[in-house]
Design a protein with these regions (language model features):
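PEST-like low-complexity, intrinsically disordered acidic/proline/serine-rich tracts
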Residues: 13-295
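Bacterial N-terminal signal peptides
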Residues: 1-8
Length: 295
């Protein structure tokens, strides 16, 4: 817990990180890993389901303007997921170490992510992050260090991408903190996103991976864009104008909560918000019960 809280205070402007970058002090994470997607269904979330996400008004407006048909555009069909998001979907993950041939200390930890065939480098040699004006990529620029036997990774220089699969955005100013913690044949991946544009507080997620010893995993992602919607006018981008999204209340109605709660914000992350929902439910139900009793 202390590890998460201290890591969550890191901001994108941080150029150096405290602690030793001794590449030989941690648990070996090498191997092929497959996700256990039990924490968040890859088919979720629903449109206008922002409950529990500390988004800004700008992120909410972006999300409500988003139309799922946008994913059918040829330029979006093969668009790579950014590092904070890519671990949440179906993938196979391979991890290995690059070591100095003389000292055998770890210079970098490499990751190959099968989704969109992404190669990621986590530098372990103590180097600084580059200038904010350096190129931004889908995987960003990552440095790592061992903490308590686990690997902590700091990533900047990310392109703008998705925070969740319902249109919530993540800006190119976002920074990612990760903890890779191995427990035998299982590995917990904790990700913490700080985004000064679209988040008011850090957004924390976890995924669990299982070590795969057998062959047969699919490591390729031969994506090729095609025309999915016939006769779409050239240059048309599916979207909703402010106030015109017809699905704003769909998730809220299905789960019997207020639209305001479904639209998220930092307040909705905390247990205290449950009391507010219960009070709202009582206020809604009580008049009906009273009217029925008077008949």
């Amino acid at each position: 817990m202390l590890l998460l809280l201290s890591a969550g205070l890191w901001t994108p402007g941080t150029a150096q990180f405290a602690g030793s970058f001794n590449g030989s002090a941690g648990t070996d994470l090498s191997g092929s890993w497959s996700p256990l997607p039990h924490e968040e269904s890859t088919g979720n979330p629903a449109i206008a389901e922002y409950f529990g996400v500390p988004i800004t008004e700008g992120a909410r407006a972006w999300g409500l303007a988003w139309d799922p048909s946008r994913l059918t555009l040829p330029e979006h069909q093969c668009q790579v997921h950014v590092a904070p998001y890519i671990f949440g979907g179906p993938l196979n993950l391979r991890i290995w170490e690059d070591k100095d041939p003389q000292s055998q200390t770890v210079i970098a930890i490499r990751q190959y992510i099968s989704t969109y065939e992404q190669n990621r480098t986590i530098w372990m040699d103590g180097r600084s992050h580059p200038s904010p004006n350096a190129p931004h990529t889908w995987m960003g620029f990552s440095t790592g260090k061992w903490e308590g036997g686990g690997l902590t990774v700091y990533t900047t220089h990310l392109k703008q991408g998705e925070l969740r699969r319902n249109g919530l955005p993540e800006s190119d100013q976002a920074a990612l903190i990760e903890h890779f913690i191995r427990h035998g044949d299982y590995m917990t991946h904790v990700s913490i996103v700080n985004d000064p544009v679209y988040l008011t507080e850090p957004f924390v997620r976890t995924q669990v991976f299982r070590l795969v010893l057998s062959e047969g995993l699919n490591w390729l992602y031969p994506c090729e864009s095609v025309v999915e919607i016939a006769n779409r006018p050239p240059g048309k981008v599916p979207h909703y104008l402010p106030g015109e999204n017809p699905f704003v209340s769909e998730f809220a109605d299905k789960h019997h909560i207020t639209v305001g709660a479904a639209l998220g914000g930092a307040e909705t992350m905390y247990p205290e918000f449950q009391l507010k929902l219960k009070k709202a439910a009582v206020a809604t139900i009580t008049p009906r019960n009273t009217a029925a009793a008077n008949k």
